[in-house]
Amino acid sequence: MESCNCIEPQWPAEELLMKYQYISDFFIALAYFSIPLELIYFVKKSAVFPYRWVLVQFGAFIVLCGATHLINLWTFTMHSRTVATVMTIAKVLTAVVSCATALMLVHIIPDLLSVKTRELFLKNKAAELDREMGLIRTQEETGRHVRMLTHEIRSTLDRHTILRTTLVELGRTLALEECALWMPTRTGLELQLSYTLRQQNPVGYTVPIQLPVINQVFSTNRAVKISPNCPVARLRPLAGKYVPGEVVAVRVPLLHLNNFQINDWPELSTRRYALMVLMLPSDSARQWRVHELELVEVVADQVAVALSHAAILEESMRARDLLMEQNVALDLARREAETAIRARNDFLAVMNHEMRTPMHAVIALSSLLQETELTPEQRLMVETILKSSNLLATLINDVLDLSKLEDGSLQLDSGTFNLHAVFREVLNLIKPIASVKKLLLLLNLAPDLPEYAVGDEKRLIQIILNIVGNAMKFSKEGSISITAIVAKLESLRDARVPDFFPTPSENHFYLRVQVKDSGVGINPQDIPKLFIKFAQTQTTGARNSSGSGLGLAICRRFVNLMDGHIWLESEGLGKGCTAIFIVKLGIPERLNESKPPFMSKVAVDHGQTTFPGLKVLLMDDNGVSRMVTKGLLLHLGCDVTTVGSSEECIRVASQDHRVVFMDVGMPEGFEAAVRLHEKFTKRHERPLVVALTASTDRMTKENCMRVGMDGAILKPVSVDKMRSVLSDLLEHKVLFEC
């Protein structure tokens, strides 16, 4: 035994125990060697593993542990020192590696524990995300239902259809057993069952609006759960054996109460709502979920908006119908007014013609009598007749002018005229009357007043004569001054007339005319009345001088046509009166100073001029008028030939006739003028053709000018007027009075 290098076991081996230890060490070694292989396999399969060095150490530790158990198989029997040395080395290495691994695990284990914490956190986060996704899906589903319901609700603008559709769609979407709408009554003190889901024509149950449950619902815009046994929820036809389903109620704002015929809300009440009640089925355990309540609230708001739109549409349709009725009534009134205006104009035209014809006889014969030898008493009577006839003729002219102004048919006849000559003509016309009444006339024309202007000369003269005539009528003594200036733009603003807006321009100017008298004056409160047609003041001493009351009314219309303004000023009775008017006149583009292209109608006193031997042809189908006009012409020394028809006029007319007076109101009157031009082709051979008419309409003048007449004279005609007409015609002046 001394030569054997073996280590004896310390105790005798038992065969059975040795056998079990041997087998156990073998399997332990096998397990230790398989674990690193498994770790290596799964680490290679893993894309991310942050602890590779730890794995190497752990693998080495396991391999060494397996090696010690494997070497330990040779230590159960007699073994050499070499085996003991290998065993020792293996255990030392195992101890070193195990200690290093243990030290490394001190740093690794917290990370491994935190990984578990993160895992739990991620699981919780994932669960939360799942819940949020569920909410999002629920919201999307709710939104889809809201859009669908909104589309159905707003697909019509009929109020009843909107409410019926709302109940049907809510019942289908939420699977409701019943859905009802309670509307306020006319008094606003009760709610009436108006619409239900299951009943087409619900019985009109009513409940007081002051119920606590109704106050609770009306106090919030959220859906409120209410008791199934409250009055507004008792809508089920059969009680059934199941527990009633949950019931919610929500208010529906009524934005347009008038459309619901609610007239008498309580004085302090702001509860302008309807009540919508929704019931879940009784045979289910369903409960109202949050998203369903939100859906109900949104639908209630959409119903309110749709009802508002429907109410607005109903109002607009009623307004349209009312407007159509008003338009029909206005159109009927317009047609009636046009018919009345045409009838009035036709009446005035006929009366004008029929009145001027006998007036022509009265004035003509009176003027003829005035130039005969009469006693003072006879002359006074003739002058009175002539004055009254002229006044009546003026009244006829005023009525016709006012009629044309009112229906808008009167238009200004603008042309270039001598403005200074207009004022001189007015002065010449009023001088005889002023001299009789011993009134001093003063005319002041501003140095910068243009000599020529563009406008309606005839209407301007008419305005000035009317105003000056009024001044003379109400002035027994003293003076009358006429002042004409170019108005400065800054002085035209008048606070009393806010709608008068003069505009500056290089092509026109504003003429300001002031007529001041020392007459009886006017009460300041009576001034506005003077511009009303047919209105007259009770001025002392003026009643005997009053006229028709149309003069100033017509003047105002003419001034307005000329883009002007007229007003009166007076400090009171006995203190005189000042009439001021402003009109807009044009400035001529250029003037030929040597020979103006126009002639102003300045009054010329022809005295007792006669026309001995002047051959005149007179055509008139009215025997009285023909006789009177012939008398005037004979009185002026003319050789007169009279005819009663156009055919006879064409046949009788010759080169010897200097003037042809024809009544264009008779049949074929204008045609006769045309045929005269055809008969006398040369201008110097044709007699002057003048219309003698009682028509004052614009068409008559246009027709006279169209057929080439040399003038148009308006009846009635006096001796002086006929004398002036003949003088102007022989001087080749064109005269158109109508």
From Swiss-Prot:
GO molecular function, one term: ethylene receptor activity
Name recorded for this polypeptide: Ethylene receptor
Phylogenetic lineage: Eukaryota, Viridiplantae, Streptophyta, Embryophyta, Tracheophyta
Locations listed in the record: Endoplasmic reticulum membrane
Enzyme class name: transferase
Cofactor(s) needed for function: Cu cation
GO terms for biological process, alphabetical: negative regulation of ethylene-activated signaling pathway
Gene: ETR1
GO cellular component: endoplasmic reticulum membrane
Domain Histidine kinase: 350-589
Transmembrane segments: 23-43, 54-74, 89-109
Membrane topology designation: Multi-pass membrane protein
Cofactor annotation remark: Binds 1 copper ion per dimer.
